[in-house]
Amino acid sequence: NISQFGWVNALLILGVLISLIVPLAYVLRGKTEDHSAGRQQAETLLQILNRARQHSGYLYLTAGFFVCGFHVMFVMAHLPTFLKSHDMPPWLFGTAISLIGITNLIGTFTFGYLGDKYSKKYLLSTLYFLRSIVISIFLIFPVSVTSVLVFCFLIGFLWLATVPLTNALVGQLFGLKYLATLAGIVFCSHQLGSFASILLG
């Protein structure tokens, strides 16, 4: 850990581990079958980017992921300070973030599974709607240890469950050939939302 090795050595170790992704990706590569239309298969990157720019569904996904990033980082960055301002016990700060992380795993797998069974766009819409309800209720009612734990459990369940649904929808709209590029642009919007939440918070 950082306290044992120092931050410089910790970053070097992290860099070495991340660099292993390149040879592993080469070994694990395979031909991906793309069942999208033949017209999509023949499109160049510039053509697909131009089509994505004009596609309302893709623009909605990008805007939604901006809001997702805003939600996620706003809670992560400002929840401890919010709890402190309400005189919550110090142990609750770390417990709250940990609970979000644990339930995030459950929620992501759950919505990923449901995305194979039901309409992804309706699941994603429901997820964003539930987030707004959970956050609103938490802010309306008095803050207590119980309300914080319930909030963290629920918001954690909805935390990054948007990711498998959003990426799958991008793949459905444009095929798999340029999925990494198009999903990366959507994710960039997520990061901009995260930045905005820190800046405005």
Predicted regions and their residues:
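Extracytoplasmic gate region of multi-pass secondary transporters
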Residues: 53-113, 163, 197
